[in-house]
From Swiss-Prot:
Main location: cytoplasm
Lineage of origin: Eukaryota, Viridiplantae, Streptophyta, Embryophyta, Tracheophyta
Protein family (similarity comment): Belongs to the profilin family.
Name of protein: Profilin-1
Provenance organism: Phleum pratense (Common timothy)
Function: Binds to actin and affects the structure of the cytoskeleton. At high concentrations, profilin prevents the polymerization of actin, whereas it enhances it at low concentrations. By binding to PIP2, it inhibits the formation of IP3 and DG.
InterPro entries the UniProt entry points to: PFN (IPR048278), PFN_euk (IPR005455), PFN_sf (IPR036140), Profilin_CS (IPR027310)
Record bears the keyword Transferase: no
Keywords: Actin-binding, Allergen, Cytoplasm, Cytoskeleton, Disulfide bond, Phosphoprotein
Length: 131
């Protein structure tokens, strides 16, 4: 299965009539492996900050997490495995696997829990596959 298929069929899937605003699978260096049509472009320093937060949980909490210049307030995640952010009526979930970052961005009416479920389910599957 291609990385694009994972994005199109597993991340951008419909859940209770809603779907993510955008999604992507990236390498730990920020290289895009696959993305939805309107996924924002991460800046290199944003990826560096995100990877540092996975290594040093809480690193982004004082400043917030930036994605394509948009600031997200970091909310409780799973140290070293999942970072979650909130911005207005939407937010972001990033799941780290051995080789990739699985990213989902949502807006209302999708809920944070629905975004978490979609992103983390695929991330957990990739971890099980050694990815």
């Amino acid at each position: 299965m291609s990385w694009q298929t994972y994005v199109d069929e597993h991340l951008m899937c419909e859940i209770e009539g809603h779907h993510l605003a955008s999604a992507a699978i990236l390498g730990h260096d920020g290289t895009v492996w696959a993305q939805s049509a309107d996924f924002p472009q991460f800046k290199p320093e944003e990826i560096t900050g995100i990877m540092k937060d996975f290594d040093e949980p809480g690193h982004l909490a004082p400043t917030g997490m930036f994605v394509a210049g948009a600031k997200y307030m970091v909310i409780q995640g799973e140290p070293g495995r999942v970072i979650r952010g909130k911005k207005g009526a939407g937010g972001i979930t990033i799941k780290k696997t051995g080789q990739a970052l699985v990213v989902g961005i949502y807006d209302e009416p999708m809920t944070p829990g629905q975004c978490n479920m979609v992103v983390e389910r695929l991330g957990d599957y990739l971890v099980e596959q050694g990815m």
